[in-house]
Amino acid sequence: MFLFSDGLQSINNNNRRKRIVKNAYIPSRGIRKIPHLSTLLPEFHICKDGKEAEAVVGWGLRPTTHKARAFAAEHQLPFIALEDGFLRSLGLGVAGYPPYSIVYDDIGIYYDTTRPSRLEQLILAADTMPSETLAQAQQAMDFILQHHLSKYNHAPELSDDHPLRSPSKPETVLIIDQTFGDMAIQYGGADASTFELMFQTALNENPQADIWVKTHPDVLCGKKQGYLTQLAQQHRVHLLAEDINPISLLQNVDKVYCVTSQMGFEALLCGKPLTTFGLPWYAGWGVSDDRHPEINRLVQTQRRATRNLLQLFAAAYLQYSRYLNPNTGEAGSLFDVIDYLATVKRKNDKLRGELYCVGMSLWKRAVAKPFFNVPSCRLKFISSTQKLARVKLSDDARILAWGNGKEAIVRFAEQHHIPLLRMEDGFIRSVGLGSNLVPPLSLVTDDMSIYFNAETPSRLEYILQNQNFDDQDFQTALKLQKMLTENHISKYNVGSSDFTAPSTDKTVILVPGQVEDDASIRYGSPQIYRNLDLLRTVRERNPNAYIIYKPHPDVVSGNRIGHISPEDAARYADQTAEQADILTCLQYADEIHTMTSLTGFEALLRGKKVSCYGLPFYAGWGLTQDLLPIPRRSRRLELWQLIAGTLIHYPDYIHPETHQAINAETAAQILIRQKNMQKNNNGLHRGCFAKKLGKIKQLYRSFK
């Protein structure tokens, strides 16, 4: 998606394909359970025993690798050390979040400076690095800083009212503590005395500065032990124990001291002066003030040379690390991971806190739960507002409602001053109807209103009115438009392509029917809200047109109201297309006339003229002919901007099997595959047994 991502991924994949596949013995069950491990290690066939092993793989320098290392030494086999990459995941590994990147080291491991590592060799060779690689590195660095990305990405930003954000704060020094048992300390030439020396030096060298010590949140609650907790009780020293996004913290200090923490390198990325007291992988190259006495020996033995920050970054993040495409599970690039983490980090921040779903059916709970499975969201289900009134709510509590929200829920939220989030199916939904219990691939979560309620601005309307759309949005929107139109993808993807095309020279107008008690009509079509009235009005305004009426699939399947008798339809329409796929009907239409139907948006994607008799989300931006004014939508949009806001920035997508977050392109690809598999079944009349079986499967996957 990013400028260099396709080229970089191609280079990585080509290099991997050239490798000869060998049998790799991996004793650790935990390593073997890493999702898509074979994709990360394409040169190996993974074995559970060492009978035919040609290499042995273990996890860094953990004590659990002693057996694997001993086996490799005994059988004179190469040992490969793996570790988490520097951009790993949204949440912690101990919380079940799999890695999207690993490092692969056939020499040592990067945090062990007692001997060489593959990363060290890559940095030493970085003086011959191609300019193209350095350009990629610069772009990646910029994106990481822009999106505040780190190894883990669940922590909140430094709050707006934090003293470190005060414009009148004095010079600020950050000292980074680490936890006992961190192997980077042991193998980085440090111990408790190193931390004491760092602390006293920082105080002595900065007598007028405010000193802040960043320690791990588990230290203060007693789960782990740090080195500086007691020392930090001194005057001028403030203890930071809360979880804070590292980049947002580092950007608000003036100077940083560390021993071996990876945050030290991130401080360099943020342009902060860094003083090191251990032997981290980034020390000794001339980019930091290094105080460890062994640095000189590393230089003298030619294990260090002068390198710049960009070269260090390129070696560590582009060459040393391997990546998955988190959307597909296939081999990916650094830019795939940056793009993905930036997206899911925004989602995690949006959903941060306690969310109470009130009065949802078991099915709706099963549908919703996977979309809120992010580290900082505490999703809770409760049967009624009466029960919620007896709950002691946290300061960050919000209520989550389906659609526009039942009146009792909305009233309760207003009376108790509790913020209300609303959710609804997304626009690329499924192969099959929601009323047939087919779960969605996408949901929208709106903290302002909901997209179909024209009575008040929604988050989608805010995005369309204010978003600074960029070139990435442009490219992705065009790609999505092409995928959806060429593969005939709509919201539900049901119906038959068996359609009698009109043989006429008249203007062909398609009138899509809607579910008449649907909220989009109640809140978005104040003048015309019945299908028959719409059909009559369209005929009155277009007496010479050829009109095709397409009933809504939920109405045809008998699940919802809005039926027009054949006799009434025939009075105003030249043709009724009951079973036909809506996109097939669109192919033969010159214009689409609608109250608020999503078909209007799908028609815009296909270059059709659209007339709106209500106020759908896509009306009022200069792309449609609107019968009703909506003055607050004052921006004139191009079609690609409407697509970007509606399909990229507003919804969330998940994989139907893994329930992992995916992007809009991957969701479209999944629907294309599903639709091709079901092309011989129109899917409107889903049998009772199929409904129940699908419901059971969804419930099991969501609550297991």
UniProtKB/Swiss-Prot annotation:
InterPro entries: Capsule_polysaccharide_synth. Keywords: Cell inner membrane, Cell membrane, Membrane, Polysaccharide transport, Sugar transport, Transport. The keyword Transport applies. It is a peripheral membrane protein. The keyword Translocase does not apply. GO terms for biological process: polysaccharide biosynthetic process; polysaccharide transport. Pfam families: Capsule_synth (PF05159). GO terms for cellular component: plasma membrane. Involved in the phospholipid modification of the capsular polysaccharide, a strong requirement for its translocation to the cell surface. This is Capsule polysaccharide modification protein LipA. It comes from Neisseria meningitidis serogroup B (strain ATCC BAA-335 / MC58).
